[in-house]
Amino acid sequence: MIEQLFRLLKKQGLGLEDTQITEAERLLKLAAVATKAAAVTLQLLQARDGQTDQAALVAFTPAEIDVLSAINATLEGKTAKQKNPHPLTSLAAATWIIARLGGWDGYASSRPPGPITLHRGLQAFAAIAHGFALGIDLAFRAGNVCIP
């Protein structure tokens, strides 16, 4: 587990060792943020097989879970083998979605997604979630949102 954490923090993941920050305090803050991001990736890695019953709320906000649900519909195929096999509110379901965004093909017969695939998926998800939030904000400003 520790080896995977360091792998995520270094070249193949967050590139922490390539930073040009020289001030100790700033470097410490960057390391803390990077470690949090790597820890989320490792949480997803542990949940990918659905052997834990953790809720997606341990790693994502309610708004992010809404975005994950919307993305899930676009990533699932037409056959049962191409569907997310986990309950949508579980961390395992979130892992399946994030892995698909990271380039995993979604088939159980394929090699399971690793930490780098999940890291790439989290990067893609962050961009999508940001765009989703901007879209909602713009709709509210324009008065185009009706809340029941």
Locations of the language-model features?
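Single, function-defining residue in the core of a domain
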Residues: 1-148
